[in-house]
């Protein structure tokens, strides 16, 4: 820069570009040591914020992907099944005999419904709209009741009737012959893995 440009014009003297020179002088004043410190401080804050935004933009999608993968591995009930406790239940809309109902449930990797406590029994009663086959059966009225997995029923709840197959109705647990058409309830453990 030549000395002519930095020369302060005399009072009353005007020359072409005088406004530019005044602007230059004011600009030089703006870059004082005090202004430099403020400038560095602002630049530092901007850089910290930029790094934070970049870090968050990288971290958030990774977290979202991780959550999606975790959600895919949680235990869930299959579509059209209802979960309670650690079990899933399926309530049929059609009627059939006890043997067909059990075959249907087995095809779904389940059994005719088994309940292990009063809470599960009450849940089943609330969700059915007519009598439904459940997983209780026996060879004759002389034999004990068994679940479809062949474990013996503990007789916690009274079973009415002299039939060989158990069903659930508004009146509780009853029994009848296996050929009578009824709706049915399947049950399975809720460790079913959701397949996407």
From Swiss-Prot:
Q: Where are the transmembrane segments?
A: 42-62
GO terms for MF: carbohydrate binding
Its signal peptide is none
Q: Which residues form the C-type lectin domain?
A: 84-187
Which stretches of this protein does UniProt put in the Extracellular compartment? 63-196
Concerning InterPro entries, the annotation shows:
C-type_lectin-like, C-type_lectin-like/link_sf, C-type_lectin/matrix_domain, CTDL_fold, NKR-like_CTLD
UniProt topology in membrane: Single-pass type II membrane protein
Xref: Pfam families: Lectin_C
Listed as disulfide-bonded, the cysteine pairs are 77-88, 105-186
Q: What does this protein do?
A: Lectin-type cell surface receptor.
What is the designated name of this protein? C-type lectin domain family 2 member F
Top-level taxonomy:
Eukaryota, Metazoa, Chordata, Craniata, Vertebrata
């Amino acid at each position: 820069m030549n000395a002519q440009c930095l020369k302060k014009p005399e009072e009353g003297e005007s020359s072409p570009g005088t406004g530019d020179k005044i602007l230059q002088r004011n600009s030089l004043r703006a870059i004082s040591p005090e202004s430099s410190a403020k400038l560095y401080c602002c630049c530092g804050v901007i850089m910290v914020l930029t790094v934070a935004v970049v870090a968050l933009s990288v971290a958030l999608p990774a977290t979202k992907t991780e959550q999606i993968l975790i959600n895919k591995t949680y235990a869930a009930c299959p579509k059209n099944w209802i979960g309670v406790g650690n079990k899933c239940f399926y309530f049929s809309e059609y009627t059939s005999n006890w043997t067909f109902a059990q075959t249907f449930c087995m095809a779904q990797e389940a059994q005719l419904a088994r309940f292990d406590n009063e809470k599960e029994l009450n849940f089943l009663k609330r969700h059915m709209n007519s009598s439904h086959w459940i997983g209780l059966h026996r060879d004759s009225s002389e034999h004990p009741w068994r679940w479809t997995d062949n474990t013996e029923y503990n007789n916690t709840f009274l079973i009415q009737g002299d039939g060989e197959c158990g069903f659930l109705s508004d009146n509780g647990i009853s029994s009848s012959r296996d050929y009578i058409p009824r709706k049915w309830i399947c049950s399975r453990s809720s460790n079913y893995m959701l397949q996407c």
